[in-house]
């Protein structure tokens, strides 16, 4: 739980062999805890510094009073068995979600997102502003973004009408 644990980017950058990091943890949110459930800012900072980490979301259920079954990963496995699931995880064929579905295409110059009906599709990079970074709904099902030369990483986030999110893992840009 990077945000809940107050992990500093400098600490994370020293780690080796990290397969993924938790972008959202429901039990690290109110009413069970303080509002430190969302670690996307920390993970964006780490990606901007050259260490893009695949993003996962979890419930980390301790209480079972509403935090359970709210965060998970959607997985693109060829079959429903251990080997296929592990293969999909190792190859990065997954994304974190609270419900929204998404498919992300990256061709080296444009990121395209196809998603379940959403209020927003937001593209995040190391740059603080870009004119076409947010696609607005209601009910949008696709968006795309072409990063500029100064942008070093890129990821997408889908937000539905209920405020639930889906997070694509960041990619390093070599433009």
Task: Describe the predicted segments one by one.
Residues 6-175:
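Charged catalytic cores and adjacent phosphate/nucleic-acid-binding surfaces used
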Residues 2-3:
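Extracytoplasmic mature domains of secreted/periplasmic and thylakoid-lumen proteins
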